[in-house]
């Protein structure tokens, strides 16, 4: 339906899509007209804006995004707090890498700036073809268990995942600002 309405869809997954915020109401209205039920909501079969930003209770939207591929993206989001002040944050996903590891890795690459900038810089490096290593044990602050063939359980002393995205193979989707 969004495509039929010429709404840009930046990334989709099984139960989500990123579209232009100012077109959400158009899409939900048309959906209701066509199918006789509400599209927007938190029930099964419904969609909703799932950005969450501490201190904001109203509308929250993405101001810029890097989409590396399915389940690998960053949105810099903003909303207004109760004092009508702008609050800026982020919404991140990286399949196979916990959010705490994203923060840990971003902090290694960029110092002395806020988390939004650190994370944006790390995603931007990936967007431009750099390989980034993610220490999934976060320098010993996380534990990952290993189930051995002899029915014993141990823990991993090293666990690094190196990711890269190759634009020549069409893996990269886009940067939207």
Regions inferred by a protein language model and the residue ranges of each:
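C-terminal, non-catalytic extensions of nucleic-acid polymerases
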Residues: 1-10, 18-177
């Amino acid at each position: 339906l969004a495509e039929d309405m010429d709404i840009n869809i930046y990334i989709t997954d099984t139960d989500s899509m990123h579209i232009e915020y100012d077109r959400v109401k158009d899409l939900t209205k048309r959906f209701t007209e066509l199918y006789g039920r509400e599209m927007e909501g938190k029930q099964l079969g419904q969609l909703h804006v799932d950005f969450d930003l501490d201190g904001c209770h109203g509308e929250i939207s993405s101001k810029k995004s890097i989409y590396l591929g399915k389940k690998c993206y960053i949105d810099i989001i903003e909303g207004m707090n109760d004092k009508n002040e702008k609050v800026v944050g982020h919404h991140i996903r990286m399949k196979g890498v916990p959010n705490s590891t994203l923060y840990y890795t971003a902090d290694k690459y960029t110092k002395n700036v806020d988390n939004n900038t650190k994370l944006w810089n790390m995603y931007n490096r990936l967007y431009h073809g750099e390989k980034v290593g993610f220490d999934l044990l976060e320098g010993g602050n996380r534990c990952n268990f290993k189930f051995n063939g002899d029915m014993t359980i141990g823990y991993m002393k090293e666990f690094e995942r190196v990711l890269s995205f190759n634009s020549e193979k069409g893996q990269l989707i886009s940067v939207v600002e």
